């Protein structure tokens, strides 16, 4: 059984070790903003050639904040559908994991 925490040799502080993430676990659902950003990122790069990655993110954030609720609705719908997909996949994944554990 792995240790939950270990003292760091350099600072003496207790460090928590993260559990290894299962590569077969379902991917989390994207937020409405992430759907918007993924769709608009290329447009922002074309309109602002030579800007840094961070600046692209700032511009996307400003554009997202400027959207009305009506303009955000399609992205919110995509996010809700993706959340449902994630919950369904996670439920199936957990059922499969419980089944393997009991075997």
Curated annotation (Swiss-Prot):
Residues 70-91 have a biased composition (Basic and acidic residues). It is found in: Nucleus; Chromosome. CDD domains: HMG-box_NHP6-like (cd01390). One of its GO terms (molecular function) is DNA binding. One of its GO terms (biological process) is DNA repair. SUPFAM superfamilies: HMG-box (SSF47095). Gene3D superfamilies: High mobility group box domain. Keywords: Chromosome, DNA damage, DNA repair, DNA-binding, Nucleus, Transcription, Transcription regulation. Residues 26-94 bind DNA. GO terms for cellular component: chromosome; nucleus. Residues 1-30, 70-103 are annotated as: Disordered. Transmembrane segments: none annotated. InterPro entries: HMG_box_dom, HMG_box_dom_sf, HMGB. Signal peptide: none annotated. Weakly associates with the stable heterodimer of ctc-1/pob3 and ctc-2/spt16 to form the FACT complex. DNA-binding protein that induces severe bending of DNA. Required for DNA-binding by the FACT complex, a general chromatin factor that acts to reorganize nucleosomes. The FACT complex is involved in multiple processes that require DNA as a template such as mRNA elongation, DNA replication and DNA repair. Also augments the fidelity of transcription by RNA polymerase III independently of any role in the FACT complex. Belongs to the NHP6 family. This is Non-histone chromosomal protein 6.
């Amino acid at each position: 059984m792995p240790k939950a925490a270990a003292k760091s040799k350099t600072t003496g502080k207790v460090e928590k070790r993260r559990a290894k993430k299962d590569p077969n676990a379902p991917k989390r659902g994207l937020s409405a903003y992430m759907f918007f950003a993924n769709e608009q990122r290329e447009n922002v790069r074309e309109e602002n050639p030579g800007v840094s990655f961070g600046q692209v993110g700032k511009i996307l954030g400003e554009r997202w904040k400027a959207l009305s609720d009506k303009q955000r609705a399609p992205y919110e719908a995509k996010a809700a559908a993706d959340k449902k997909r994630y919950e369904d996949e996670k439920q199936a994944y957990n059922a499969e994991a419980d089944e393997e554990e009991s075997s």
